[in-house]
Amino acid sequence: MTDVVSDFDHVYNIIRNNYNLNYYLNCADRSNNVCTIKYLQERKSYFCCAVDESTGRCVLHRCVLIVFGTWLDKKFRKKEFSGGDATCGGGGGDGDQDQDAIDERSNIKGTFMIDGRFLSFPNVMMNNNILMHNFYDKLYSKNCKRMFLYGNVDEEKRINRAIQLVYDDHEDVLFARDVYAKDYVVSENLNETLETYLRSSGKWEPLNFLFDFDKNQTDKMFDRIKMIMRAEINYSIDSLSNKIIYKHAYLTHLLYRPVLKMYQASKIDSAAAVSESNGSLRKLGGNQSGAMYPKDCKKIVDTIVNGKLIHVISKTFSKQKKNFLNHQDNSSNNNIEMCPPMIKYRVGNEVVRIINDNMRQDMLKQEYDFVKFVDSFFHGEMTVAGKKFFLCRDVRLPNVDYESIAKKFKDLIESNLIVRRDEDENGSGGDDDDDEWLMIAFNNRPTTFSCKRKHLVRIVYEFKRKRFPVEIKLSKSILFVNHHEGMICIRKQVRINEKVNISALLTPYEYHNVESIIGQIGARIVDVDHVSALMSKTLQYYYRSHLHIFATIPVPKLIVSVTNLKNAMPVIEYDDVEWNENRDMFIRNLPVGNSVVASPGSVHNNKMINLWTLVRDSRLMTAEDPYIPNVTLPVKLFNNKVNRLKGKMVYASKSKTPLVKFFKSESNNFVDTNEGHVLAMAGVIVSNVKINWTHDGKRYKIETCKNKSFYIFKIYTFLRKIRSQRIELIDAKLSTLNDFVYVKFSIVTSTNNLDGIKICGIHGQKGVMNSSEDLTEWMAEDGTHAQICLSPVSFLSRQSNFDYIERKYVVRGGDHTDPSAVRYPMFRIPYMLFNNTPEILQRIPQTNYTGHEKIEGTRLDQWSINQSFAGNRWAEGLQCVRGGTNLPDSSGEYKVLTSLLHCNNVIVN
């Protein structure tokens, strides 16, 4: 898992400390430097400015994205963090504490805000093009390896050109493709060109001393690169060893870097100009206040708003034209909208895989090395083979830090564990001596350093201890040391020589591969195999007392359970004291949409409630739906509906000043209609100009009348009437922007009638609540009674089990003194509630592109068919596939099936 808040804290510190910039909410009004969540939710976006105090100019103008929970957020919302910031000056009153509690309950840390919506950006997985990788090109052959050498940096055009090296295994030929896409065979006369690219990488400047080649080494450059590219790659393109995952914070930092570099260059130029004129040059021309790079800052904001941060890495993505927008494809906009309160630990752990449209099914394979790195159960969109998934709890995505890598190399040079060595010192005949030496390559590039094989254990110890983010591979006479952007690591203990334990970060290659350096030096990974190792922190949190079910109930039921977790209504705890004292505040701070409010004894977590469950039937009521609830449950359903009505003021004369006044309803003003609806009044608007309202006439009712001077608009809204419904709050608010008028209308309703609500148990048994029954006659000795009944047929057919679950024994009628009375077990099971909302209709495309679009909830596209097949396929079927041809080799179908089954924790030997 990753910590988005600490990652962004790091980015803000770099901008502040390395470039001496100060943060302001608005560089035009620096005295007003505070805001609130309520202010931001009025369709505001949460960006700030980074200002150079010495000149007063704004460098990053209204484009620094502020993430909730970071120190920068606390600086601007310090009034809301009572006692949370040194500059609070004592904080505020009760309102501040309430807001702090809302922050905690809504779990908004790690998200950002655009247009009043909470958003999060997932980590992005791509193929690793930084290191050498297998490559297939029509120009060469099927068995090639490719590597990009960066280093031809053009500061003026702000690009880092790369040369592409392609090595053909069969022919032992090295090809190169230069920046103008000319192909040529590499020979010794290209050594100097290669050296140019290697000497200054353009990516890891602090490590340039590793590539300080002398004449002898330059002459051997061609052979050294060939030697590196001969190293065998024993994993496929679909392996996690061949992937990198980009963090949100890293991509954001890359987005700001070109502007910050321009600013740094301009500072150096202006300092030089001032010194040349002996300090007499005071004004450097141009506007000395305002934004320095307005166009660049506008591009930054557009990139963030459109969810196209990945374009910072890959120019190819930004050049791709999409003719058909696919609603199931995430590559168009990667921003994920979050409705608070969010699922815990979701932000920062969600990964989306950028995939190529024409290779969709191939790219979805999960190889064996995904195990323990990617959550085997929780796939955010129920995509089993996974375009979208979660990282396991022990997985880390380390920050790129070439300075610390350079320091580590210098320490090893001081210790004489690695030395600068020229092969010609020992002549060409010292084969035995050469076997003793290992050439060191950094990120698959040859360096000027080598080490002795006998020092290997010590070098691995120095590199891997204290969770240092470095990958080490050993291939024949080359020691590969890798540290680059997007590294994926897992936190583990490694025991060296059966004596020394170190805390290490291991990559998928080091952890899973048979040729891992851990095995080659005789070390071993100290591992405790438990089902929790296959899970993300999200799943460990929500299922922490029921982890045994992941190994004991069928996979399809687990998929039902974890998918419904995502869709479940939020659960909010309350007690009678809080309800009586702070009822109004409690209602106003409810999340938008449906929520479950339950007593403290019933709340399991913010998505589940505990109910005492009896396995029984009553008059075959559970034949269709497996649940019968008690007539009274310690649960209330609340609905917080927010409508926004927009109108435009129409007036011919520009000299006329429009006047608008809004009178909202003093009390909860509503009336029942005959058609099963409720008509609620928002209020009355009086205006001296006409207002044209944008609405379809179905949700709102607007009555208009006018006299000589004014127009009067009475605004009503309709809501559906349900049984036992109570209207808790009707509130309305008016705001204006230019010629537009906005009315925000909130209605909070509650009900204790749960008939027809969908419910899902933690074991994946879902159904609609049937008509309720009095279950108080099923009484335990301590007075606890049954709260819900579960169908016995459903329990058996879903292969559920109630092991390790709290239980009590009940007697019908509650007379425990009768020794002949039958004792029935009753179980305390966590449940999720969710309702059928018509929001799914918004996701159904109006036009057909492929003919496989979702229609009325039935999923018939290739994607969903594939997922259903994968999720419900049993392992036994594999033997038929393998044995069908009576050949020892596995068939193609077998490989696809094993790949899909890795997602269901079935490892096939």
UniProtKB/Swiss-Prot annotation:
InterPro entries: DNA-dir_RNAP_su2_hyb_sf (IPR037033), LEF-8 (IPR007025), RNA_pol_bsu_CS (IPR007121)
A single GO BP: DNA-templated transcription
E.C. numbers: 2.7.7.6
Main enzyme class: transferase
Catalytic activity as recorded in UniProt: RNA(n) + a ribonucleoside 5'-triphosphate = RNA(n+1) + diphosphate
Keywords assigned by UniProt, alphabetized: DNA-directed RNA polymerase, Nucleotidyltransferase, Transcription, Transferase
Pfam families, alphabetized: LEF-8
Residue intervals passing through the bilayer: none
GO cellular component: DNA-directed RNA polymerase complex
GO function terms (MF aspect): DNA binding; DNA-directed RNA polymerase activity
Family that this chain belongs to: Belongs to the RNA polymerase beta chain family.
Function: Required for late and very late gene expression. May be a component of the novel RNA polymerase activity induced by baculovirus infection.
Name listed for the protein in its UniProt record: Probable DNA-directed RNA polymerase subunit beta
Organism: Spodoptera littoralis nuclear polyhedrosis virus
